[in-house]
Structures are given as structure tokens and as C-alpha cells.
């Protein structure tokens, strides 16, 4: 394997350092608020929970539903009531007390409970509250899951006319979404039209034009939508919502933010297609995402504002969050209205197969006039009514309501992203803040009860990053909790901005509260603190100090600050950011660092980059050191292996010397000659030239290596016990039992293998490890190639015992698995015993063409390789080999003969030493081999 160059760690380090700033720029960090505050010490009249004599409100709270501001009157829709607040009276210092209210209770609560609904769900929740005209108000409520609508006078809040059906105008359940708006005398509503909320509908009614609706149960039009906002603009009515995506259904239930529109002049289709349905319904995706190589999307629309001036163009501000099962995060994106209108001129998308991807439709397949166009205007100007449109246009718009591409954000990236805080839920925008009415301020509500006041990028700060001016904890558990869970009770579900009254109304499920847009009095007489807050609602007055700015400011308000002017009183050091108390003149200010403090501060990204660089550098240096150490150790180990003449216990070369065969070892190399390393890996097949087998052909293999004995292991007896090789079948009726020879001594069982050419025919009995080591490292006398090998006669060997004899053994300790140490014996030269009818278990497979009596596949003049065979206990077995060849026997001491023998395969040793011939000596009886 090629080694990595030493410069690779440095390249990886440079790549890491170069990627850190890009990663930081790709995903902005959460800004830190300059000022934090809460409503502790605020007047109790700042909250409104409901009527004091309402027992249900005392238990459940307000159950807020919707805000509506008309003619300096704030209308609050809630459970069973609509409250009216005079904003002029509130501005004069009165508390949050309604001057009028209407009560509309459900008369069908008993039937609602019979349907299996809870009592808390059977109240009349006012979900729709829109002005019908300048004098009349339309209110629709759930009415115990039987929605109804009424009209009321705006000033008197008295009912006018009869009740109307609320189906397709108001949802059945208070938890279902709905939006509604009047345009040219007709009510455009979007909600669920049935009890199960399975029929989502965009509906037009209550006007001079015929009622129209969206396609029923068609997921291409609407798929489980959650409607957020409705807007009339130009010739169209726009609906903003989120729904389960149809183009990415393979990813699961992924929600996308959408905007759909219909023509106000739409009269429906012909009887052949889209009769009493919209012929101009189109929708496209709103893209709020962080750009980069891998785009990070905020797909779930939570709230949207009306048109606000942004950089001289009309824009909508929306709050978006991530998917419910994704990393929690929120973002604020703005969309220009002209970009939205331009998006509806994009390409149509279609799905050509059931599991295929959605792709744009080529322009040559789009009929004319362009589907979705308003009749009498633009491309369909030649058609006076939508009912006159061609059928192919109507059928195409029915099957292709989705457009491509998505609408990009106004600044091509979010104005604000938050990933380490609670999720944003609501947004309100003041596009005319400050003394010159040219500053945009965002007010954001979250699901933990906090309100953020934010300057978007490019505002007063003239920077590219948003500035969180203030973070306010607006929730009060004592006033707003009710019977809800703490998490649900803290969620902000409504924001209403009163710029003339310099107030922000915040709605929780159980109450509403109003906040001042600024807290300039906290800066007191500290000019530096007042100006460092960057609050467009605060300014410095020479005589009155830091004061609130409402409307255009006079010449006596200093906005930039005169550094030479005298500061009134002591100022807290803005660099510390400490908050000693509400009375502090610079309570909570964290800006306007002094030059010395700014020079001493270290940016967090730079600190992280330094830590990563130090870690990478240390890892690379450690890797180099470890690599050098391992390389040196390998070089030293290879040098030790190549050095001849050093004794080593039981090394591969020692075994090769012990068991090797063939010619004498070569003489030591001369000076300058490289040492010849013997070949360690060789084959067991004979060489093609018919010569001697390789040097290591007699090396033992893992199968031939005997196992060490175990101390004090007794053999278990039984009538069905077999030996280790399973070959204790009957060997003849006339043979004595196993373990007893004819002379009264134990009969040994041996494994025999003919030696390969060049291997000695004699062996050395080795019973201890010390003897083996002495033999390995002892002197090597010269070999006598023609010296006859001494052998001991085997005529006195007793016959094999009966199969059942091995079942009864003495109680002496046995070696491991009942196998005593092996001994090398010399076979007799006499007559060989008849071969057993059972083939040797250690014989090779017939496929190899070797073994006892099988036909050899190679020429007979070539000596076959030495193989292992089994010899019965009664005498030596037949072995393959010519005359003059000797066998290698594996014997066992006398004291352990007759016991079961574990199968082992031992190859013949090839040793350059002259074999030490010794006849087998009987081991003393009762000898134990406990190692």
C-alpha cells in the first residue's frame, strides 16, 4: 500500500482553515440581544383575560382567536365573545378594558357532547372576523361543530340580519385553520368544509358573482393545507398557506409553503370541465432558505404580514420554521409582491408517472391562451368570460395547478435566522419607524412567550447582519395559564401593532397584553447608553435626556450624538453589559465597546479556527512521529530476522532445521554476498522434475500439531463412548480388549506417514520441552546419506483391543482430551499387517489421486509425496512408498496406551542432523504426564 506523502496533513489543515470562514458565512449565527427585559412591575391593567364575572373565562382563560383593527378600534375575537377596545382611550392612560363586547353562545352544546366531543370544544369560537363594508362586520363561529355566520354593526356590535351557514366559510373545529377576506363584495374564504376536515376548500360566496370552489379531494390542488393569510392585490386574491408536498412525496410528509391565487373575474368553467370550479387556480412554492452548496430550507410558514415598504418596494414579511422532525430553527423572509406576480408566469409542473419526479412542462405542450389567465385581461383578453375558454385549457389547468420555480426571498436569503432559541410563531412589522419614518422594525413572537425587536439588515445600522435590539419576556403565568399545559400557554398566537399609540398587543391563548414599543426611560441621563441602544424609537434630548420618539422628530432630538456634549449623570460601562437593576441608567445595554476593550476581545470564529488548527497540527505531528517509530521498529525486526546464527526457541527456521531434508545447508555467505533467505512457503506436491520435495515439505501444519495435556482430567466411561477418531468399530472377534495387549502391556496406537524423499527414516523421542530445545540448538554432525536406519522390531506389539475395552480405564490423571504426549518410533522392516477394511481417516481426498490403494494419477516412476495414513493397534498399516522407505510413527508412553487417541496429523521431519536411532523403550507403568 503506498504511503501518504508527508505534506498531506498540511494540505488537510489548510483545507480545514479555508473552509471555516465559508461555513460561517453560509449559515449566519444567532445575534445577541442588546437589551433584555420583562414585564415585572407592570400595571395589572396591561393584561386582559376576559370578563370578570365570566366563570368560564376564570377557568379557561380568554381563548383568543383573532385581532382586527378598524378606525382606531381594536376588535378581539375569542370564545363566545367579541371585545372592542378604544385605542384612543387606551392611549390616554386607561388600562386594557373593553368599552363594548358582544356575546354569542352556542345553543347546541348538548348535541355536541353526544357526538363524542369534549365540553371545552363545544363552545362557540369566533374564527372569522372581517369587515363586510365600512359599517358591517361579518363574524363566523364554530357553534359546537355546526359553524354559523352573523353580521354585526362595527360601532354598535349589534346583530344585523339573519344567521348564515358557516360551512366552507368557518371550520368546524377551533383548531382548524381559516382565512377570509372581502373583495369586490364577495367573501373569499379558505378552510375545511366538512366535519372530518378532509375537504379543504378555497371558496367564494356572499357576492354578486356565482359561488366557486376548488376541486374536491384533489391532492394536486390542496393536500392538508394550513391557511395563514389572504390578500387582495390587483386582479387576484392571494392565499398563503402551508401543505403536505405532492412533488416530494417520496420523502414522507414534508410540508411546503405555498401561495395560490384566483381571479376575481373568474366565473367558473363550462359544463364539460370545471363547472362551478375555479378556472384560474394556480399555486407555487415560497422559498425561504439559506443559500449554499447544500441549501438549508425553512419550509413551514407560520405567520405573514400585509404589504410593507421595503427598500422602496411593497413586500410581505413571513415567519418560517423547519420541519417538525428536523433541527429546530426559525427564519424571517420577505417577498416582494412583484416577484410573486412574476412567479405565476413560470412553467407548469407535471408528474409523468405515478412514482416519477415532477418536471416542467415544455412550452409547446401548453395550450393557448395560457391556463390560469383572467378572462378579458392579458393573454385571455379575447374571452369575455372564463366559461368561454377552450376545453383543453380547462382540462390542462385542472391537471397542472403547480408552477415552477419557487418565489425567491427579497434579499436572496433570510433577514434573520434563529437556531438556538425558541421557534418563532408571529410577526408584525413597522415600516415607518424612527423620526424620519424610514426605518423598518420587526416584532417577532415565539413559542416561549418572548418578543424580539429586530432591525433587519440594511436598516439603520447599515450593516449586513440583523440586530436584535430587545428581548422581552411578555408571559405571565398567573394571568395567562388557564387549564392548558405550560408549553401551550406560553405560545404567542397573535401580534397587533398600534404605531399611533406606540404599543404592541401580544396575544396568548389565555390572555392578551400590550407592550410599549420602547423603554427609553431606562437609559435615563446617559447619552452614550441611549445612542448605543440603536433603538429607532429612542432619541437624545439635550434637556430631557433619552426620550421616546413618536412620529417625526424635531430639531431638538439628537440621533447621532454629540461626543463633546456633557453627559448627565454617571453611565454604566457598555462593554460589561452587567444589569444591576431597572434603575440603572444603562440597564441591559451591551453595545458601544471602548476601543481598548474591542482590541482585547477575540472573535469566537477566530478562536474556534485556532483551536481546530492546533488540533489538526498536533494530530499531524503525532501521526508523523508514530509513522517514524513504526518504520524503525519494522526495520529492526527485519534485520533481526535476517541475522543468522542467533538461537531462537521454536522459530520457523528452527523447525525447518529439525524437520528439513535434502542436501546439507549451504555454507555461510562470503563477504559482500547477500544472505540467502530460505523459502518459507512451498507446496506439498512433488516437483515436476521428480527431485526431492522442497525443504519445508515436512513442516508440521496446524492439523498435525499435538495439543498440550490437561491436568487431572479423567476419562469418562460408558457403553457408548467412542475414541476421538470415531473408529472403534469391531476389529475382529479374536482380539483382546482395548488397553490390554497379549502380553499384558498396553497396546499403542500410532499414526504413520511415509517420509518424502530426502527425509530421514528415524526419529528422536522427545518428551519434554527442554529436550526439544537442546536438540534444536545442539551441534550438527555430518550426515551420512547411506547410513542404514536402525529400527526396533514390532513383532511383539500386541493386537488391537476390542471396541468396548476402551470404555473402562483406570483413574489415573489423563492429559488433555485423553491424548498423551506423542513419540516418534521406527517401524519394523518385517511383514506388514493387512490393511484394515476402513480407510484411513487422515488419508487425502480421492480427488487428489494419492493414498493407500487408489490409483495414482501421476507417472509411477515419479515418487508421490509423503502422506499420512493410520496404522491399527495390532501392527503397522500399509503405506504407500517403495522399498527402502521408512515410516514415521507417532507413539505414546507405555503408561497411557490403550486410551482413546485424538486424531492428529504429523508430517515427517526433515532434519539436516543425523537422526538419533533409538528403539522404543517401554514407559514405566503408572507414569503420569502432568504438565
Swiss-Prot record:
<feature type="transmembrane region" description="Helical">
    <location>
        <begin position="606"/>
        <end position="626"/>
    </location>
</feature>
<keyword id="KW-0217">Developmental protein</keyword>
<feature type="disulfide bond">
    <location>
        <begin position="520"/>
        <end position="538"/>
    </location>
</feature>
<feature type="glycosylation site" description="N-linked (GlcNAc...) asparagine">
    <location>
        <position position="438"/>
    </location>
</feature>
<keyword id="KW-1133">Transmembrane helix</keyword>
<keyword id="KW-0524">Neurogenesis</keyword>
<feature type="topological domain" description="Cytoplasmic">
    <location>
        <begin position="627"/>
        <end position="931"/>
    </location>
</feature>
<dbReference type="Pfam" id="PF01403">
    <property type="entry name" value="Sema"/>
</dbReference>
<feature type="topological domain" description="Extracellular">
    <location>
        <begin position="26"/>
        <end position="605"/>
    </location>
</feature>
<keyword id="KW-0732">Signal</keyword>
<feature type="compositionally biased region" description="Basic and acidic residues">
    <location>
        <begin position="893"/>
        <end position="906"/>
    </location>
</feature>
<protein>
    <recommendedName>
        <fullName>Semaphorin-6C</fullName>
    </recommendedName>
</protein>
<feature type="disulfide bond">
    <location>
        <begin position="480"/>
        <end position="511"/>
    </location>
</feature>
<feature type="region of interest" description="Disordered">
    <location>
        <begin position="777"/>
        <end position="931"/>
    </location>
</feature>
<keyword id="KW-0325">Glycoprotein</keyword>
<dbReference type="GO" id="GO:0005886">
    <property type="term" value="C:plasma membrane"/>
</dbReference>
<comment type="function">
    <text>May be a stop signal for the dorsal root ganglion neurons in their target areas, and possibly also for other neurons. May also be involved in the maintenance and remodeling of neuronal connections.</text>
</comment>
<feature type="disulfide bond">
    <location>
        <begin position="263"/>
        <end position="374"/>
    </location>
</feature>
<feature type="compositionally biased region" description="Low complexity">
    <location>
        <begin position="693"/>
        <end position="708"/>
    </location>
</feature>
<feature type="compositionally biased region" description="Pro residues">
    <location>
        <begin position="911"/>
        <end position="923"/>
    </location>
</feature>
<dbReference type="InterPro" id="IPR036352">
    <property type="entry name" value="Semap_dom_sf"/>
</dbReference>
<feature type="region of interest" description="Disordered">
    <location>
        <begin position="556"/>
        <end position="591"/>
    </location>
</feature>
<feature type="disulfide bond">
    <location>
        <begin position="526"/>
        <end position="571"/>
    </location>
</feature>
<feature type="disulfide bond">
    <location>
        <begin position="112"/>
        <end position="122"/>
    </location>
</feature>
<keyword id="KW-1015">Disulfide bond</keyword>
<feature type="disulfide bond">
    <location>
        <begin position="140"/>
        <end position="149"/>
    </location>
</feature>
<comment type="similarity">
    <text>Belongs to the semaphorin family.</text>
</comment>
<feature type="glycosylation site" description="N-linked (GlcNAc...) asparagine">
    <location>
        <position position="287"/>
    </location>
</feature>
<keyword id="KW-0221">Differentiation</keyword>
<keyword id="KW-1003">Cell membrane</keyword>
<dbReference type="GO" id="GO:0007399">
    <property type="term" value="P:nervous system development"/>
</dbReference>
<feature type="signal peptide">
    <location>
        <begin position="1"/>
        <end position="25"/>
    </location>
</feature>
<feature type="region of interest" description="Disordered">
    <location>
        <begin position="655"/>
        <end position="747"/>
    </location>
</feature>
<dbReference type="InterPro" id="IPR027231">
    <property type="entry name" value="Semaphorin"/>
</dbReference>
<feature type="glycosylation site" description="N-linked (GlcNAc...) asparagine">
    <location>
        <position position="71"/>
    </location>
</feature>
<feature type="disulfide bond">
    <location>
        <begin position="530"/>
        <end position="546"/>
    </location>
</feature>
<keyword id="KW-0812">Transmembrane</keyword>
<feature type="disulfide bond">
    <location>
        <begin position="288"/>
        <end position="333"/>
    </location>
</feature>
<dbReference type="GO" id="GO:0030215">
    <property type="term" value="F:semaphorin receptor binding"/>
</dbReference>
<dbReference type="InterPro" id="IPR001627">
    <property type="entry name" value="Semap_dom"/>
</dbReference>
<feature type="domain" description="Sema">
    <location>
        <begin position="31"/>
        <end position="517"/>
    </location>
</feature>
<keyword id="KW-0472">Membrane</keyword>
Amino acid at each position: 500500500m503506498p504511503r501518504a506523502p508527508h505534506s498531506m496533513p498540511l494540505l488537510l489543515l489548510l483545507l480545514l482553515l479555508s473552509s471555516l470562514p465559508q461555513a460561517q458565512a453560509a449559515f449566519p449565527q444567532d445575534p445577541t440581544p442588546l437589551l433584555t427585559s420583562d414585564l415585572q412591575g407592570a400595571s395589572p391593567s396591561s393584561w386582559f383575560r376576559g370578563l370578570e364575572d365570566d366563570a368560564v373565562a376564570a377557568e379557561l382563560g380568554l381563548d383568543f382567536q383573532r385581532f382586527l383593527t378598524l378606525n382606531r378600534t381594536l376588535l378581539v375575537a375569542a370564545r363566545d365573545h367579541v371585545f372592542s377596545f378604544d385605542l384612543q382611550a387606551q392611549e390616554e392612560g386607561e388600562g386594557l378594558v373593553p368599552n363594548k363586547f358582544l356575546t354569542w353562545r352556542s345553543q347546541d352544546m348538548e348535541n355536541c357532547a353526544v357526538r363524542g366531543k369534549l365540553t371545552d370544544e363545544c363552545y362557540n369560537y369566533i374564527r372569522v372576523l372581517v369587515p363586510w363594508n365600512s359599517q358591517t362586520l361579518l363574524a363566523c363561529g364554530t357553534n359546537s361543530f355546526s359553524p354559523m355566520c352573523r353580521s354585526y354593526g362595527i360601532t354598535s356590535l349589534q346583530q344585523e340580519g339573519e344567521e348564515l351557514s358557516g360551512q366552507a366559510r368557518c371550520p368546524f373545529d377551533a383548531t382548524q385553520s381559516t382565512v377570509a377576506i372581502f373583495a369586490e363584495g364577495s367573501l373569499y374564504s379558505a378552510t375545511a368544509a366538512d366535519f372530518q376536515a378532509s375537504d379543504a376548500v378555497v371558496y367564494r360566496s356572499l357576492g354578486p358573482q356565482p359561488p366557486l370552489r376548488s376541486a374536491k379531494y384533489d391532492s394536486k390542488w390542496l393536500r392538508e393545507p394550513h391557511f395563514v393569510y389572504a390578500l387582495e392585490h390587483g386582479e387576484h386574491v392571494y392565499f398563503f398557506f402551508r401543505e403536505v408536498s405532492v412533488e416530494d412525496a417520496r420523502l414522507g410528509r414534508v410540508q411546503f409553503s405555498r401561495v395560490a391565487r384566483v381571479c376575481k373575474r373568474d366565473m367558473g368553467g363550462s359544463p364539460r370541465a370545471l363547472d362551478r370550479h375555479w378556472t384560474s387556480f394556480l399555486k407555487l412554492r415560497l422559498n425561504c432558505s439559506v443559500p449554499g452548496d447544500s441549501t438549508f430550507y425553512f419550509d413551514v410558514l407560520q405567520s405573514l404580514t400585509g404589504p410593507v415598504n421595503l427598500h422602496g418596494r411593497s413586500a410581505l414579511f413571513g415567519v418560517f420554521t423547519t420541519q417538525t422532525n428536523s433541527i429546530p430553527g426559525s427564519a424571517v423572509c420577505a417577498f416582494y409582491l412583484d416577484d410573486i406576480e412574476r412567479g405565476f408566469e413560470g412553467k407548469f409542473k407535471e408528474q409523468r408517472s405515478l412514482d416519477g419526479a415532477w418536471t416542467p412542462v415544455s412550452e409547446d405542450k401548453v395550450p393557448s391562451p395560457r391556463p390560469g389567465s383572467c378572462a378579458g385581461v392579458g393573454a385571455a383578453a379575447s374571452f369575455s368570460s372564463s366559461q368561454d375558454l377552450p376545453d383543453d385549457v380547462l382540462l390542462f389547468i385542472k391537471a397542472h395547478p403547480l408552477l415552477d420555480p419557487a418565489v425567491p426571498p427579497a434579499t436572496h436569503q433570510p433577514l434573520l435566522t434563529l437556531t438556538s432559541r425558541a421557534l418563532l410563531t408571529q410577526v408584525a412589522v413597522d415600516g415607518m419607524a424612527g423620526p424620519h419614518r424610514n426605518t423598518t422594525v420587526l416584532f417577532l413572537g415565539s413559542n416561549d412567550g418572548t418578543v424580539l425587536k429586530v432591525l433587519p439588515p440594511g436598516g439603520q445600522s447599515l450593516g449586513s447582519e440583523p440586530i436584535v435590539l430587545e428581548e422581552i419576556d411578555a408571559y405571565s403565568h398567573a394571568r395567562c395559564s388557564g387549564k392548558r399545559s405550560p408549553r401551550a400557554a406560553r405560545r404567542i398566537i397573535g401580534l397587533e401593532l398600534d404605531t399611533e399609540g406606540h404599543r404592541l398587543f401580544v396575544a396568548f391563548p389565555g390572555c392578551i397584553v400590550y407592550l410599549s414599543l420602547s423603554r427609553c426611560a431606562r437609559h435615563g441621563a446617559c447619552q452614550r447608553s441611549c445612542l448605543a441602544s440603536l433603538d429607532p424609537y429612542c432619541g437624545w434630548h439635550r434637556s430631557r435626556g433619552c426620550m421616546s420618539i413618536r412620529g417625526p422628530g424635531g430639531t431638538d432630538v439628537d440621533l447621532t450624538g454629540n461626543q463633546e456634549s456633557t453627559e448627565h449623570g454617571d453611565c454604566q460601562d457598555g462593554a460589561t453589559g452587567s444589569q444591576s437593576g431597572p434603575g440603572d441608567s444603562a440597564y441591559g445595554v451591551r453595545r458601544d465597546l471602548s476601543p481598548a476593550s474591542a482590541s482585547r476581545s477575540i472573535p469566537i470564529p477566530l478562536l474556534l479556527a485556532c483551536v481546530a488548527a492546533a488540533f489538526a497540527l498536533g494530530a499531524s505531528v503525532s501521526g508523523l512521529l508514530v509513522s517514524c517509530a513504526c518504520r524503525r521498529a519494522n526495520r529492526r525486526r527485519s534485520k533481526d530476522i535476517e541475522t543468522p546464527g542467533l538461537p531462537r526457541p521454536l522459530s520457523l527456521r528452527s523447525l525447518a532445521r529439525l524437520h528439513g531434508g535434502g542436501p546439507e545447508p549451504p555454507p555461510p555467505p562470503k563477504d559482500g554476498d547477500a544472505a540467502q533467505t530460505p523459502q518459507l512457503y512451498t507446496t506439498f506436491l512433488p516437483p515436476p522434475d521428480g527431485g526431492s520435495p522442497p525443504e519445508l515439505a515436512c513442516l508440521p501444519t496446524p492439523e498435525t500439531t499435538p495439543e498440550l495435556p490437561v491436568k487431572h482430567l479423567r476419562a469418562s466411561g460408558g457403553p457408548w463412548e467412542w475414541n476421538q477418531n470415531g473408529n472403534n468399530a469391531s476389529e475382529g472377534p479374536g482380539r483382546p480388549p482395548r488397553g490390554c495387549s497379549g502380553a499384558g502391556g498396553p497396546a499403542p496406537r500410532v499414526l504413520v506417514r511415509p517420509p518424502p524423499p530426502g527425509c530421514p527414516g528415524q526419529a528422536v523421542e522427545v518428551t519434554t520441552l527442554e529436550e526439544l530445545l537442546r536438540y534444536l540448538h545442539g551441534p550438527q554432525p555430518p550426515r551420512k546419506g547411506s547410513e542404514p536406519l536402525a529400527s526396533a522390531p514390532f513383532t511383539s506389539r500386541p493386537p488391537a483391543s476390542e471396541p468396548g475395552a476402551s470404555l473402562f480405564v483406570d483413574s489415573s490423571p489423563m492429559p488433555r482430551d485423553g491424548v498423551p504426549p506423542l513419540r516418534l518410533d521406527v517401524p519394523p522392516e518385517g511383514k506388514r499387517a493387512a490393511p484394515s477394511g476402513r480407510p484411513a481417516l487422515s488419508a487425502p481426498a480421492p480427488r487428489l489421486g494419492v493414498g493407500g490403494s487408489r490409483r495414482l494419477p501421476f507417472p509411477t516412476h515419479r515418487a508421490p509425496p509423503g502422506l499420512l495414513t493410520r496404522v491399527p493397534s495390532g501392527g503397522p498399516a500399509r503405506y504407500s512408498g517403495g522399498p527402502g522407505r521408512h515410516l514415521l510413527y507417532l507413539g505414546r508412553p507405555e503408561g497411557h496406551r490403550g486410551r482413546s487417541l485424538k486424531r492428529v496429523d504429523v508430517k515427517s521431519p526433515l532434519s539436516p542432523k543425523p537422526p538419533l536411532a533409538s528403539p522404543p523403550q517401554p514407559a514405566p507403568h503408572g507414569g503420569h504426564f502432568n504438565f
